[in-house]
């Protein structure tokens, strides 16, 4: 029976239903004034492939088993619906890292690379986060890295990517917490969260990177039949159980907030989701000391109808998944 369901899902993924142009997937009621990202129509990949089904890497959500999907699935880079339904079965996409190794942080000469001790050798690694990260990228810190065995063939300059760090929290309940520091992970986790029913309302037609006026929002979807936008911000800064954003001034972040506020004033449902890339967080607040303009913009957006959400994450060495609500203090 299970094999029949999986085959049906695979067949549906390759049907003409999944061959439509991105414009046909825009939720009803979206008066988009910009252009969809280039390349989506020709380069879009189907949700699943027969090989993935036969190997057991795609399962209906009713099967409580971890999925073994590559972290950068083609789905993440097109605007096709994240949910493929066949009867009551639905494909679930869960991000997962492969070839994880551990290392010890030595130094970070610039935003993009770090020197890490791996198996006794100092190795240059790519840092998948351009933030400052000064509070946990300290000499001797224990890091998680993803090894890329085909780095040379892929044209990569480094064979390792730093994706996580263990942070010691002296005097706090979680004395050693695992923090995911991959800046690409929050958007993927947010899309999965929406597709899995993260909002209490009925969400359909989830899209990535939709252009509206002169803006591009991380997520667009239909909520109870109403068009909605969502901006996603990954949070790695934490002190004594309080998460904060940003860790450095971000004019781009202020711009995103004001654009989302404009959409809310025009009648769209608008959300900002702060994805806290760790567990054990008591509260979230904008980092007013670092960027007061960001804090002011966030409060103004909230007063204008933008819904401010914060969620912590279950983080393992191989996965990150959005979990529980966190109290937002503006």
Predicted features, each with a name:
Residues 110-115:
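Short aromatic-glycine-enriched beta-strand elements
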Residues 198-212:
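A short acidic/basic microdomain associated with nuclease active sites
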Residues 14-15, 21-23, 27-29, 34, ...:
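Targeting/processing segments of secretory and organellar proteins
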Residues 241-251, 258-290, 312:
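Nucleic-acid nuclease catalytic cores
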Residues 122-135:
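Beta-strand/loop nucleic-acid-binding surfaces
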Residues 67, 75-92:
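Short, positively charged and aromatic/hydrophobic N-terminal segments
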Residues 103, 217-246, 260:
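Conserved catalytic cores of phosphodiester-cleaving nucleases, focusing on short active-site segments
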Residues 92, 277-330:
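Domain-level recognition of nuclease-like catalytic cores that cleave nucleotide substrates
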């Amino acid at each position: 029976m299970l094999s029949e369901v999986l085959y049906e899902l695979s067949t549906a993924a390759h049907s003409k239903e999944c061959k439509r142009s991105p414009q046909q997937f825009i939720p009803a009621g979206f008066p988009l004034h910009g252009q969809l990202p280039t390349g989506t129509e020709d380069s879009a990949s189907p949700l699943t492939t027969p090989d993935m089904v036969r190997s057991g890497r795609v399962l209906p959500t009713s099967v409580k088993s971890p999925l073994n999907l590559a972290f950068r699935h083609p789905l993440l880079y097109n605007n096709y619906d994240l949910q493929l339904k066949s009867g009551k079965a639905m494909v679930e996409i869960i991000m997962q890292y492969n070839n994880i190794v551990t290392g010890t942080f030595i130094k970070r000469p610039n935003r993009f690379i770090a020197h890490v001790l791996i198996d006794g050798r100092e190795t240059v690694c790519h840092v998948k986060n351009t933030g400052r990260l000064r509070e946990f990228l300290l000499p001797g810190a224990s890091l998680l890295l993803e090894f890329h065995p085909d780095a040379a063939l892929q044209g990569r300059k480094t064979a390792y990517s730093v994706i996580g760090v263990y942070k010691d929290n002296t005097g706090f309940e979680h004395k050693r917490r695992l923090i995911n520091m991959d800046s690409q992970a929050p958007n993927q986790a947010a899309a999965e969260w929406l597709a899995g029913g993260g909002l209490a309302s009925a969400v359909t037609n989830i899209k990535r990177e939709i252009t509206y006026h002169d803006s591009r929002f991380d997520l667009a979807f239909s909520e109870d039949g109403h068009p909605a936008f969502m901006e996603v911000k990954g949070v790695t800064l934490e002190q004594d159980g309080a998460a904060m954003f940003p860790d450095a001034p971000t004019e781009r972040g202020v711009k995103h907030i004001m654009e989302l506020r404009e959409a809310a004033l025009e009648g769209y449902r608008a959300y900002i989701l702060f994805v806290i890339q760790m567990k054990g967080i008591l509260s979230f607040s904008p980092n007013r000391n670092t960027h007061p303009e960001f804090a002011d913009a966030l409060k103004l957006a909230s007063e204008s109808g933008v819904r401010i959400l914060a969620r912590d994450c279950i983080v393992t060495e191989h996965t990150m998944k959005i979990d529980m609500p966190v109290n937002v203090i503006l």
